[in-house]
Amino acid sequence: MSARVLQVHEHTWTPADRAELQIRSLPVDVPRDVEALRIDLDVAANVGSVIDLGAQSPRGYVGWSGGARRQIVISAEWSTPGYLPTHGYAGTWQVLLGLHRVPADGARTTVTVRESNAGEVARLRALEPADPPVPLRPPRRTLPSSSGLTWLAADFHTHTVHSDGSLSVG
């Protein structure tokens, strides 16, 4: 039995679309009886196209995999790495597309959202590499902070013409 297709979005994105709004939301109405979701992103072969993928449930952010994945599955028990296991599917979801790189002649995408099931979730989970073991770590050092404030580690960086970006810093 094939999985029920809930929504198909086909679009050719242009540089003007990217300039207007870099992250696009594609709505998908998900009925109550859905056990799990599978989202497939097909980007037509076009040199220079980079389209990122993410998802948002009616309750909020579920995940983002950037341009690293073209298929994701979301269920209450397990979801593709980069996505939170999520339950309570009914309502309007958003498939998020990041228009990271759109060539002058456009980037044609087809997004297909299907109902999935426990068997498919287990099959896709088995294809993922096992989680690496968590290394033993020494206790964290404490840093001085004002009452109620906490130090957080962060990684501030940018992608420019000096690496894999297309814009300059200035």
Where in the sequence are the language-model features?
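Solvent-exposed, flexible loop/coil segments flanking beta-strands in beta-rich domains
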Residues: M1-A44, R140-S145
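Short alpha-helical segments and helix-capping/turn motifs at coil-helix boundaries
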Residues: R24, S79-G82
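Residue-level recognition of well-ordered beta-strand positions that form the cores
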Residues: D29, D40-D42, G54, L96-G98, ...
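Noncatalytic modules at the cell exterior or secretory-pathway interfaces
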Residues: E35-L41, L84-A107
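Edge beta-strands of jelly-roll/beta-sandwich modules across compartments, strongly enriched
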Residues: S49-I51, P103-R114
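Extracellular interdomain linker/stem segments of modular secreted and single-pass surface proteins
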Residues: E115-E120
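An N-terminally biased module of ancient metal coordination in phosphate/nucleic-acid-related enzymes
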Residues: L127-G170
